[in-house]
Amino acid sequence: MAGEGQRAEPEREGWALYVTPRAPLREGRPRLAPQNGGSGDVPAYGTPTPSRHGRREVRFSEEPPEVYGDFEPRAAKEKARVGRQIPLEGFRPDSAKEEVRESAYYLRSRQRRQPRLHEAEEMQTRRAALLQQQPHSPPPPLRPSPVTTRRGLRDSHSSEEDEPPSQTVLSQTVTKKAIRRTQETPVMSEDPLISLRRPPLRSSRSEAASVQQKVNFLEEGETEENDQDSFDSDVTVKVRSGDSVESGDQTTRSSSQYKESFWQSSQSGDFTAFDEQPLKLSSGYQKTPQEWAEKTVRIRTRMLTSSPGMRSIYGSFSDDDSVQKSELGNQSPSTSNQQMTGQPKSVSSVKTKRYWPFAVIAALLIGGFLYTRPPEAETTAVQEFQNQMKQLMNKYQGQDEKLWKRSQTFLEKHLNGSQSRPQPAILLLTAARDAEEALRCLSEQIADAYSSFRSVPAIRIDGASKATRDSDTVKEEVDQELSNGFRNGQNAAVVHRFESLPAGSTLIFYKYCDHESAAFKDVALVLTVLLEEETLGTSLGLKEIEEKVRDFLQVKFTNSDTPNSYKHMDPDKLSGLWSRISHLVLPVQPENDLKKGICL
């Protein structure tokens, strides 16, 4: 590549003036020299080989021609229809023509080209020769094109893979512990038009490698360091991360003791350098190596504060922070690094992180106070009911444990309902003849315990006193007593000798004991049934006792011998009534210490 001459462009005549020029053919790679030492038949680099004549050159489109290196606008072509046209290739320097050919090759062939070591050395040698031939006249700035931009991005990725991690540009070897000051390479200023180039193509590297960053460094207040440097200029630093910039005897190398992970994180800046520009400032003033060393230290510090990888460490810093530049202008790398690491975060973020735990705690306390605090009235009612039941347990010690446990749990659950109660609590107590007084006392005291919080006695209805009366009249009386009592604040009622009521009158309990449409749902009804047996065995289970009570009521309400019972009650109605009053059936045992007519 170093010794390749420039090809002469053929002149266009006749109809060729009106035809869009075809893109240059892809130049083949140089063949490897034979192993036996003979190299007479090895073609020069760039010579098309006959072995690849069958490959078809695929062009994406005939328009626009700018894609294939022809940057002449369409309007200029239409005006200059007559006359000899001079190709634009002639006005480009040799290095630009070479790049156009290579870029057209890369555009048609998407496969990444892996540069070799000897090719990189030849390119560096040719660039050094061009710089020596033109020391005082810099070449005109090239118009950036999509092709050259893609090539710059691709070469930056290739050079990152080829070069060892110990080599870097602009001394990116900065850690949190220390900054080693090394020799720095002067970085040239670029044409502002370069910043307007098209974004790079999608690459297989990480997203951080596709983001290009510009670091603007404004020279100001440097009269105390350099008496000659009295001008202000903006230096745009664009360095391709991973490429080595060689100028004279100045090189940039990193220490081998830094870790590989930090090297990869420093690559994410993806700075871009253009090798075609001489190492000069835009103002034409060239500094000594010592001045460049001091200048690059400040540039390096600015890049660290504005790079995406380090921005999360130092907080949020803007690239045009004048206070930051004035403080870092006269400091050494180590001093500036210590100052940067000690920089606090923004005031708003600190205040937010300081006060948000208190806000969360306050919200939790308020929510717990409003939603998790149980109602004080219901808690007190349950506690009062439990105290009353404990007293009854101490008085009536002859009762079975199942009576206390099941009745207390059943009524306490209904009393402690935090939501609206779906149905009333129905408790049915039964006993034999020997426990008639205990049945009466316990039923009344349990109902009073349920309503003890309201300090009102339970409603009492005696069915034995209404046995011989008309069923319709008894039905109206029972309905009136229950409805008036519940409306006046009483929430419990006890009905003694339920089996003695006229059969027709018991249908009123459909209204008060229904599962879904009960007239009062936040009340408790205690019903008692006195069996005809003399003694109720203690060995009977709850299921057997429930069946015994059901059979007894069926005989009592449907027997034709019973007055006023047959025409008002049938088995279907009795089954519906039984399903509503048999929520919980519990037996009551006799008490020896209980006297007739006096409860304990």
Swiss-Prot record:
The modification Phosphothreonine is found at residue 223. Residues 372-600 are perinuclear space. Residues 376-452 form a coiled coil. Residues 247-261, 325-346 have a biased composition (Polar residues). The keyword Magnesium does not apply. Required for nuclear membrane integrity. Induces TOR1A and TOR1B ATPase activity and is required for their location on the nuclear membrane. Binds to A- and B-type lamins. Possible role in membrane attachment and assembly of the nuclear lamina. Residues 1-14, 71-81, 91-102, 116-125 have a biased composition (Basic and acidic residues). This is Torsin-1A-interacting protein 1. It is found in: Nucleus inner membrane. InterPro entries: LAP1C-like_C_sf, TOIP1/2, TOIP1/2_C, TOIP1/2_N. Interacts with ATP1B4. Interacts with TOR1A (ATP-bound). Interacts with TOR1B, TOR2A and TOR3A. Interacts with VIM. The gene is TOR1AIP1. One of its GO terms (biological process) is nuclear membrane organization. Residues 192-203 have a biased composition (Low complexity). Residues 373-600 are annotated as: Interaction with TOR1A. Residues 219-232 have a biased composition (Acidic residues).
